[in-house]
Regions:
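N-terminal auxiliary segments of SAM/dcSAM-dependent transferases
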Residues: 1-40
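Soluble, non-transmembrane catalytic domains of enzymes that act on hydrophobic metabolites at membranes
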Residues: 23, 28, 42, 145-150, ...
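Short, basic/glycine-rich phosphate-binding loops at helix/coil junctions
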Residues: 35-44, 144, 176
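Surface loops and adjacent helix of pleckstrin homology
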Residues: 44-46, 112
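A short, flexible beta-alpha/helix-coil linker loop
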Residues: 46-48, 149-152, 184
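Loop/helix-junction capping segments adjacent to catalytic residues or to phosphate/diphosphate-binding pockets
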Residues: 50-51, 188
Length: 223
């Protein structure tokens, strides 16, 4: 069935939710739902962009001061790109953003449904964040957003020391990271609770539970 024109779809969405489904090799089916003029990207079990996730990240960014609006930012797990307006419009960040996203189907939806594409100040890379990060230059980013989910599951690499060591390496001294995790996920790199391991690694750690399932870690590289 052909899609309704954008303006008509928006008007119809005030009467009934409109959903388009896109197959994903990583997340089963992606669902783009328009309801009362507002569009969200979901899987069968989780919000990926522009819904609850955006609210969680907005809350977390309240704990991340803007030291330098022009400083470079790294986003690990772009999804549909709902973190970008938070960085640009709400925090006033103007610097370059490098965004890594594993799923090409998600990037296609980001481009066609949300107009999120690479441009002069946004470099989008379709890659595995855990493979990409070790090749990034050291001390490159003032802020990193870590939002690496596959549906409602965290990748096992988040429980390994290597990822957090690489994250520390690519942050500038004094740089910060906002990490979106799950309260139900037990992460024990090198046999230590994650916050304890991160403090020994050289981070100041703030641990926040939000929205029942989400756990936010606010990190700052100390040296």
């Amino acid at each position: 069935m052909r899609l309704l024109p954008t303006t008509v779809r928006r008007l119809v969405s005030y009467l009934v939710p409109l959903t388009r489904r896109v197959p994903s090799a990583y997340s089963g089916w992606l669902e783009i739902t328009t309801w009362r003029g507002h569009k969200t990207l979901n899987t069968a079990s989780a919000n990926y962009s522009y819904g609850l996730l955006q609210q969680v990240l907005r809350y977390g960014l309240r704990f991340v001061p803007v030291a330098d609006a022009a400083a470079p930012v790294l986003v690990l797990g772009l999804g549909g790109g709902s973190v970008l307006p938070l960085l640009r419009h709400e925090q006033g960040r103007t610097g370059p953003v490098t965004a890594i996203e594993l799923d090409p189907a998600v990037l296609e939806v980001a481009a066609t449904e949300f107009d999120v594409r690479s441009g002069p100040n946004l470099h989008i890379v379709c890659a595995d964040a855990f493979a990409w990060l070790p090749a990034a230059p050291p001390s490159s980013f003032e802020l990193a957003i870590v939002d690496l989910f596959l549906d409602l599951t965290l990748p096992t690499e988040l429980g390994e020391a290597a990822f957090w060591q690489q994250l520390w390496r690519v942050l500038q001294p004094g740089g910060r990271a906002l990490c979106n995790l799950l309260t139900t996920a037990e992460l024990w790199p090198e046999g230590q609770p994650l916050p304890e391991f991160l403090e020994e690694l050289g981070f100041a750690v703030q641990d926040i539970e939000v929205e029942q399932l989400n756990r936010l870690l606010i990190l700052q590289r100390l040296a």
